[in-house]
Amino acid sequence: MDASHRRVMMASAVGSALEWYDFFIYGTAAALVFSELFFPKYDSNTGLLLSFATFGVGFFARPFGGMLFGHLGDRIGRKPVLVITLMLVGVGTFLIGLLPTYESVGVWAPIMLVTLRLVQGFGAGAEYGGAVILAVEHAPPGRRGLFGSFAAIGVNIGLLLATGVFALVSSLPKEDFLSWGWRVPFLLSIILIVVGFFIRSRVSETPVFSQIAAKNKAARSPVKDAFIKYPREFLVVLGARLAENGLGYLYPVFTLSYMTKQLGLQKSMVLNGIMLAYAISLFTVPMFSMLSDRIGRRPVYGGAAIFSALFAYPFFLMVGTGSQPIIWLALILAISIGNSGMFGPQAAYFAELFGPKLRYSGFASARELGSILAGGPAPFLATWLLGQGNNEPWLVAAYMVTLAVLTAIAIYFGPETYKTDILADKADAKR
């Protein structure tokens, strides 16, 4: 692995770290404090539902960002688009840390919060897809799973950083946490913005896009063409996202709220358990990715989805014991094994599903449409289901099983791609 490959993997990881740091601190703040700061006129359960609704709003902006920046990424190149998306996500998050609360400006506070959430979502719509494509299109044959996993590793780094920062500030006295402590994680995002901009400005354009540009073969309408030429692949991505993205937000966001507010567990204990699970995922994500380079994307992805379906009910039984070691083990099995087993091979798999001229548009658009169905509404729906079940988690567990089973079905009907030529135009091959 030479220096250029290392730069590519760092560039891939740092943007994903920023995106998911930003999104996780928002989700954590929504679970812990936003109901008091931005929706104080409502009872605690309604305020929490409204907080999670603002969390979901950003996901509705993601497909539009995916379509616009995916179009640009297939037209002008992967690198310039990745610099733009990095800045949009980072600046939106930093500004949330400067927002006045409802006590200061009334209804304008949640309006500004939702606006910045939309900015975050718009930029994030093409961030992860572009980071993956940057890595996969630079990868040597037979190592696309490993190279693509660096974007996924960046996700876990971002989640780990976010959890760690929130664990520190949540240990403050409640008055300090509500007055200024919650702002610190958002303001610290400026560090990742600066580092990410420096690294991405030094990385080269991918060899695949360079060949397309040299032959003047860039697609005129890549988003429309991707929908028309890859309908099966779009459906596979949508289905594959249900469990990976839905459970990926339920475990750290909804269950954080459930364990602290319904079970009365300490925030620091739960956050430390989540942080441990993501630390272990730094190793399990590339492990599952490398395994997918050897045996294929579908067996690894589908196997992890089945595991997640089987583990949904045991997860809540383990959490319900109130025992720290058992709760931490539940989080490790759910996040480091079940979710990482899907997330690891996903990067290369989604990139390989689409041909080079439409890859960015197809990947970003399909993936972020999946976000609307999965991660965006997941905490809100889980909170609503919890209320419908008299604060017992079994309806939530059934929802999780449903997501995982649908993902397993989508993977079963999807094509295997780990031996495909990354330069081949699959749409042309179909005709």
Region spans (language model):
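Extracellular/periplasmic helix-loop-helix junction of adjacent transmembrane segments
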Residues: A30-R62
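C-terminal transmembrane helical hairpin of 12-TM major facilitator-type secondary transporters
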Residues: P299-P345
